[in-house]
A protein has these predicted regions:
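A structural signal for short, hydrophobic/glycine-enriched beta-strand patches
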Residues: 79-235
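Membrane-embedded alpha-helical segments of integral membrane proteins
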Residues: 2-50
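Hydrophobic alpha-helical transmembrane segments of polytopic
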Residues: 4-7, 67-73, 237
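A transmembrane-helix-recognition feature enriched in membrane-embedded lipid enzymes
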Residues: 231-249
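Internal/C-terminal transmembrane anchor helices
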Residues: 58-83
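Membrane-helix interface/capping segments
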Residues: 48-59
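Membrane-water interface at transmembrane helix exits
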Residues: 17-21, 46-49, 76-84, 244
Length: 249
């Protein structure tokens, strides 16, 4: 129990620090709540066990059974989604594909978030080797509402030597599904190369590919590394995202 208590305390501090850095999302909140519950359950397990021994009514047993089923379902979903996330990797890239870069947050000053900057830097490696590739930067207004992710990404690419006439903006999307759907519209409206390379974070490749198939894109995937200090939050958030896409379909 001491190990669980320490783990719960560590998780609580970790996710509080993550939120302090400005990465406030459903993954961070979930991680924080679960960590607090683990800490409390481990610290007060003797009191909890004593309380449980005094409450053995049928209603109590039913509540416990439901709780155990919910916990089992959550763990099962977590294992399945984690397996799916780990199962997809970057695959071989064709030359001069249309590059679709998926947005992931903008800082208050309009600069890309650390996660989005990793995606851009990964895309730049391919773009410098494929000078005839067109680029679609995809992402609307972030939660702060000041800058669109697409505009922030365009500015960053231009600063790093990419010509502006190669870049097409998709600045209306607010979800991965809309990223793919609206980018497909930009692709068709501008008669760009139908073979696309979707650039996103490594943890996000499964869902990006899932939606690319849904919209019948001829696609390949290129994953970027995720900063270690936000990976747990984004990983948990991605589990919700995968579940949402399954339900939406």
């Amino acid at each position: 129990m001491k190990i669980l208590e320490i783990a719960g305390l560590f998780g609580t501090i970790w996710f509080l620090c993550t939120e302090g850095l400005g990465y406030w999302n459903i993954g961070t909140n979930t991680g924080l709540i679960v960590s607090v519950l683990i800490f409390l359950a481990a610290k007060y397990h003797c009191q909890i066990r004593e309380w449980c021994s005094r409450h053995k009514s049928r209603f109590y047993k039913m509540i416990c059974s439901i709780l155990y089923l919910v916990i089992a379902a959550v763990i099962s979903l977590a294992v399945i989604t984690t397996g799916l996330i780990l199962s997809v990797h970057s695959n071989g890239q064709k030359e001069n594909s249309t590059v679709i870069i998926l947005g992931s947050g903008v800082n208050d000053d309009g600069r890309p978030s650390d996660v989005m900057r990793e995606r851009l830097d990964t895309a730049l490696e391919y773009l410098n080797d494929n000078p005839h590739s067109a680029i679609i930067v995809s992402g609307g207004l972030d939660d702060q509402g000041g800058y669109t992710e697409a505009e922030s990404m365009k500015d960053y690419l231009i600063e790093h030597g990419i010509k502006s006439d190669r870049i097409y903006l998709e600045n209306q999307s607010h979800s991965t599904r809309e990223n793919i759907e609206y980018s497909e519209t930009v692709l068709q409206n501008n008669h760009l190369n139908a073979s696309v390379l979707i650039v996103t974070s490594d943890f996000h490749l499964y869902r990006a590919g899932y939606l690319a198939r849904h919209y019948h894109l001829d696609y390949e995937l290129l994953g970027s590394p995720t900063p270690w200090y936000v990976l747990p939050s984004y990983w948990i958030r991605e589990m919700y995202g995968i579940l949402h896409e399954w339900i939406a379909d």
